[in-house]
């Protein structure tokens, strides 16, 4: 068994070097300042520990208008990525920015998976950024895997 902890990702109440794996599934990775939560992940991970996190893909972020689902056309400039305001503050760094953020905190990128929907995908009730038609053509989410030395 392992403990599941619900806490502020910018101030995790765990001791240094206490975890082998840190996961964020659209939590800290979207709604917290990336430099702050990635620093916390680096602090609590043991040497060789892995950080796995999901974010909206860069392409879906560029194709989402201020309100409504992703469109087939770009809705904002690439330069607008980073700290963004939708219903609240969200963070959507570019791939290059993620690599820099991870590197600043001692991580190397092991993998980046740009996820698309499968042929039998259906639209979930809770996810309105991109429908399954859009997500079957372009990546709706990015899954990052990073590791400490």
What does each model-identified segment do?
Residues 21-35:
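A short SAM/SAH-binding and catalytic strip from SAM-dependent methyltransferases
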Residues 10-21:
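A short acidic, Gly/Pro-enriched loop at the edge of an enzyme's catalytic core
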Residues 35-50:
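A short glycine-rich, Lys/Arg-flanked "PGG" loop and its adjoining helix->strand segment in the class I
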Residues 87-112:
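Short alpha-helix
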Residues 105-108, 125-149:
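Core SAM-dependent methyltransferase catalytic element
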Residues 7-10, 56-68, 99, 110, ...:
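Class I (Rossmann-like) S-adenosyl-L-methionine-dependent methyltransferase catalytic domain
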Residues 50-84:
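Conserved class I S-adenosyl-L-methionine
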